[in-house]
Curated annotation (Swiss-Prot):
One of its GO terms (biological process) is DNA-templated transcription. Coiled coil: none annotated. InterPro entries: DNA-dir_RNA_pol_omega, Pol_omega/Rpo6/RPB6, RPB6/omega-like_sf. It holds the Pfam family RNA_pol_Rpb6. This is DNA-directed RNA polymerase subunit omega. One of its GO terms (molecular function) is DNA binding. It catalyses: RNA(n) + a ribonucleoside 5'-triphosphate = RNA(n+1) + diphosphate. It comes from Paramagnetospirillum magneticum (strain ATCC 700264 / AMB-1). The RNAP catalytic core consists of 2 alpha, 1 beta, 1 beta' and 1 omega subunit. When a sigma factor is associated with the core the holoenzyme is formed, which can initiate transcription. The keyword Transport does not apply. Promotes RNA polymerase assembly. Latches the N- and C-terminal regions of the beta' subunit thereby facilitating its interaction with the beta and alpha subunits. The gene is rpoZ.
Length: 126
């Protein structure tokens, strides 16, 4: 039965590889609880998906779009404007200058240790 179904589906989706991807997407949709457009007839989800594609009861465009969205790993985001980038680069350059200054201080034997404790000056009147 599946062979006949695949042969019918190839008429709708000529590329067999694309057919496998689309049918797999529809089978995952069915597993997730999507409503069936054909009777199950005790068939498993991939066979039901192929039957739906062969009978043209599901929109192929919607399945292709869902497939593309599920396979996308990189989502494009808006890039920051030039002014923001210039400010970021300037901040980064200042940070590198500070690191260089700290390295020079360490080479000279100087260090800054911030313990967070305040020094109290005793007046000696205890």
């Amino acid at each position: 039965m599946a062979r006949v179904t695949v042969e019918d589906c190839v008429l709708k989706v000529p590329n067999r590889f694309e057919l496998v991807l689309i049918a797999g997407q529809r089978a995952r949709d069915i597993s997730a609880g999507a409503k069936l457009t054909v009777e199950r007839d005790n068939d498993k989800n991939p066979v039901v998906a192929l039957r739906e594609i062969a009978d043209d009861t599901v929109p192929l465009d919607a399945l292709q779009n869902a497939l593309i969205q599920n396979l996308q790993k990189h989502v494009e985001v808006d890039e920051p404007e030039e002014d923001e980038m210039e400010g970021f680069i300037a901040d980064r350059d200042l940070a590198f200058e500070n690191v260089a200054n700290e390295d020079e201080m360490i080479e000279d034997g100087m260090s800054i240790n911030d313990t967070g404790a305040d020094f109290d000056v005793d007046s000696g009147d205890e």
